[in-house]
C-alpha cells in the first residue's frame, strides 16, 4: 500500500536555487513597473525625516567594488530607516566636472580640443558625462539600490550650477573669497592648481644636496669667510632662492674644518659632520638664530643677495637648521618672505618649464634641471655633497605625476577666518568611527586657505568680472544675475557670451568708466561643486531637508567631500551640513593587497552579479567589517554564496511547511504556544532586538552574524529538525502541527522583513510565497518590533539547559553511528542517566523522542548503575542502543506496535490511527 499521499510533505513555488543572475533583473523590472521608490515615499510621508545625502561618485567609467560597497551600505541604511518609522528619501548624485572627463575626450576619444571653442569642447564634455551617468545608473540599479534614479542631482545641471554660484556669492559677500598670489600645489601634468584634497603621496627618488651660501655681510656676527649650509631635495628651486631662514631661538655653531668656516644648527652639527665627512672640526663660536637676522649671503651662482631671516617653522628634524628659502615655491617660504619684503620669484610656467627668470635654465623642464643646477653648484664650489633619497612626495591624484609648489595668482576661500566655527562644527557632529572627529579636527586646524580656482575648461566658472583698471567686480547684483543666467542657460553661457552680456542690463562701475569689462577665465575646484550640494540639493529639493542626518563615504573623503562640504556650509550657514558622518575603508583583494590590473586581482561588481547575483554581493558587504579595509576574492564570494544557500534553504523549508496554513484560520493563539514553541518565539524576539541594534549602529556585520546564526543554529539544527516528524506525519489540524506552523509563520514573516534591507530581491521573492500577506512587497511593510517580554527568564533557562543536554545526546548518537550501533538516529533507543538537576529538567520536558529525533527515550531510575557502554557527560550519561521492533513504513520510527493494526501491517499504531481517522478516502 502507498502511504505517500497521507504525508504532508513541504510544497512551495519558492525554488531551491535562486538563479539570481536571471531572476533579479526580472524582479527589478517589477519594481520599476510598480514604482517602488514612489510607493515607499508615499507610505512613509509624514514620518520624521532621515536623510542620507549621497556623496556624488565621479561620472567616468564602470563602477568598481568600492562603489558597490558604498552604494550597497547606503541602501542598507535607507531601506532599514524607511521600515523603521522614518521617511527616508534617497537622491543619488553625480560629480561631473573636472580633468578626467577632459582627458577621456582628448586621449581616449581623440578630440582635438584646440580645433574648437571652449564652449563647444564643454558641450562634448557634458555629453560624455551624461553617457557615463546613464551607464553607472544601470549598474547601481542592478545592485538593487533603491532611490530616485530618474531624478538624481547632477553637478552639471543648470539648477545645481545656479545654486553653486549663490554659495560663492554668499561667501564672497562675507569676505571669505579673495584673490592672491601665493604658492599652491601645481600640477604641470594637469597644467592647473590643485587643492590639498587632490594630492596623494607616493615614494619618489630625489637628489639630496648640501650647499654653501657664502656670507657677504656678517654684520659683525659672522666672519666674512663663513658660509651657511643648507640642505634641499629640490635643486631645481635654487635659481629661485632669495633667502635662508633660521629659527630665532635655536643655537647655531660657527665651525672651522678643511680651511673653511660653516654655520649649522648646533643640534644638527653631529649629523652634518657625518653627512659631509668633516674632520678636525673646531667650534669657533655659537650664536642664536636671532643674532643671524638680516645677515647677507650671496646666491651661489647669480649676482644677487640671499638674506638670512628668522622663521618659526625651522626644526631640527633633518637638514642643517638653515633652510633654503624660495618664496615662490613654498608656503612657509612665502610667509617669511612676505614678512621680510622679498619678491615672489617663480621662474617656472604652467607646464613646468623654466622661464627667463632662471638664466641658464630657460626652456628646460623643471625636473630635468636638477642635474644642471648640481653641476653649476659644483663648478662654483658651493656643492658640499650630492646624494639621493627616496621619500614620500606629493603627486597629482588624477595623473599620478609629481606636483610642485608654484606661486600663481589664484582664488582662495579663507579657512583662517572661519577656523574656530569649523572646529566647533566638527565637535557638534557625531563621528563613526570616533577617530573621524580627530582626523577632521586636525585637518581643519592645520589646513591653509583653500585654493578654489583651476586653469581648466570643464567646470563651473568663477563668477567674477574685472574693471578697466583690473579691479575685481563681484556683488550681490552680479551674482544674482549670473545665477539666473546659469539657471536658464547653464554655465556654458559664460563661455558663449562677452562679459558685458553676462552683467545685469545697464550695469556700471567706477572701475570701468568706458563701460568695458572682462571676465574671469578660471573655473572652480570640483570639490567646490560637490561641496555645495547641501545648498543645491538638501535645501533646494522639496523631498530633502538640511542638515542631512548622515554623510557616508570612504575614509579618503575626510580630506575631500566631508571637508569641502563643511567649509562651504559653515561659511554660509554657520553649521555643518551633516548631523553625523560615517566612513568606510577600501576594498582589497583576498590577501589584503590593493587591486590592480598588473596583479590581475581585480574583482568587478558587474562580473560578480552576472555569475552570482546582486544579493550575493550585498551579503558579502554585510559580512565584512567595512569601517576597516575589507577583502574580496572569488573564494571569499563562494563562501558567502554558501551562506546564502543556507539562508535560502531555511526560507524554503519554512515556506514549504506553510502550504496548507492560513494565518487567519489556523494560527494558534500566542498564549497557547508553550514549551519549545514559546522558547523559539523568545529567541526570535531576541534576534529582532539584536538586528535593530545592529542596523541602528550601522554594524551590519553583527546583523549578518545574528541572522546567519539564527538560521543555522536555532532553526536548521534545532527547531526545523524536530518539526519534521510532526509536520509531515500528523494530520493537517493536529494541534502540535498547527503550533509549529504558527511559529514558522511568525518566524518567516519576521525574518523576511529583518533581512529585506540586505537581500531585497530574495526577501521580496520570499514575501510573495508567504500565505496571507497583503502588501505587494516586503518593502511596503515595517520592521517587526522587539517586545519587552516578561516572565520569560524561567522559560529561557529551562530550554538553554535542555539544549546543553541535547548537544550531549547528539554527540552520543554520533559516536554510536560511527561505531555502527545505529544508522539514522531514528534507529536509536536512549537510556538517560541524569544528575538531580538534569532529571528534573528532563522530566519537565514533553516529547523527548521528537526533541532528540529517536524512536525511544527512557530516563533511568535514581540510583541505577550507569553501564560501561554509556557515554558520560557533565550532567547526564547516555546509553545508545538499537531500538527494538520494526521500522514503520510511514514515519520511519522503530516500534513494537508495527503491525498491530491488521489493515495497516507495515505501520506503527500511531500512524495506523492517523491514516484510519484522516485518510480513509486516500488508502
UniProtKB/Swiss-Prot annotation:
EC number: 6.1.1.5
Keyword line: Aminoacyl-tRNA synthetase, ATP-binding, Cytoplasm, Ligase, Metal-binding, Nucleotide-binding, Protein biosynthesis, Zinc
GO MF terms held by the record: aminoacyl-tRNA deacylase activity; ATP binding; isoleucine-tRNA ligase activity; tRNA binding; zinc ion binding
Compartments, record wording: Cytoplasm
CDD domains: Anticodon_Ia_Ile_BEm, IleRS_core
Keyword Aminoacyl-tRNA synthetase: yes
UniProt motif ('HIGH' region) ranges: 57-67
Gene3D superfamilies in UniProt: 1.10.730.20, HUPs, Ile-tRNA synthetase CP2 domain-like, Valyl/Leucyl/Isoleucyl-tRNA synthetase, editing domain
Intervals of motif 'KMSKS' region: 594-598
Binding site for Zn(2+): 888, 891, 908, 911
Record note on cofactor: Binds 1 zinc ion per subunit.
Pfam families assigned to the protein according to its UniProt record, in alphabetical order: Anticodon_1, tRNA-synt_1, zf-FPG_IleRS
Binding site for L-isoleucyl-5'-AMP: 553
Domain remarks in the Swiss-Prot or TrEMBL record: IleRS has two distinct active sites: one for aminoacylation and one for editing. The misactivated valine is translocated from the active site to the editing site, which sterically excludes the correctly activated isoleucine. The single editing site contains two valyl binding pockets, one specific for each substrate (Val-AMP or Val-tRNA(Ile)).
Function of the protein: Catalyzes the attachment of isoleucine to tRNA(Ile). As IleRS can inadvertently accommodate and process structurally similar amino acids such as valine, to avoid such errors it has two additional distinct tRNA(Ile)-dependent editing activities. One activity is designated as 'pretransfer' editing and involves the hydrolysis of activated Val-AMP. The other activity is designated 'posttransfer' editing and involves deacylation of mischarged Val-tRNA(Ile).
Protein name as annotated: Isoleucine--tRNA ligase
Protein species of origin: Shouchella clausii (strain KSM-K16) (Alkalihalobacillus clausii)
Gene: ileS
